[in-house]
Amino acid sequence: MFNAEFFPTPAWLTEEMLSLVNLRSVHSILEPSAGKGDIIEVIRSKMHRPRIYCCEIDPELQMILNGKGVTILNDDFLSFTAQGYYFDLVVMNPPFSQGVQHLLHAWNIISEGEILCLLNAETIRNPYSEERQLLTKLIADSGQVQFYPRAFADAERQTPVDVALVHLRKVQVACHFDFMEGLKQQAQ
């Protein structure tokens, strides 16, 4: 069944993820590792005509997504630049072996918005690498994490792994210009 890291997100867990955001304020959504569209289907059930885009590297899964009318922007999310696109919500369950890279890449390509990401819980609990330490700091500065033991134990594709739901919020920093200070500097 597809690749070794294909673990479709259970609907109940997607519901938990989406409960952390106000979907009424969301305009454009990216699902970077869409699989066969399980997360997308739950989003579609909660929103009227959402603008959802995705990336998916597996050609067979791409065919399934095409059949569901999902817009695929790129195959490999880690090479996706998002140039010309704006996403205010990224929802993902990336391959566990690349979870940190996917989450950090998502953070880098959005200018403002929220990210909901499922990771292997060990990614958070054991920050042995520089990337994991960076992620730990990012969560401390801009987000939160919730742990779900054995969340995929009864899923379509089962695994006893504990997962971490990371919720990050990126706020665009406004440029502040003091007009009076600018005039004072010009006068000098």
Regions found by a protein language model. Give the residues of each.
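Class I S-adenosyl-L-methionine-dependent methyltransferase catalytic core
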Residues: M1-Q188
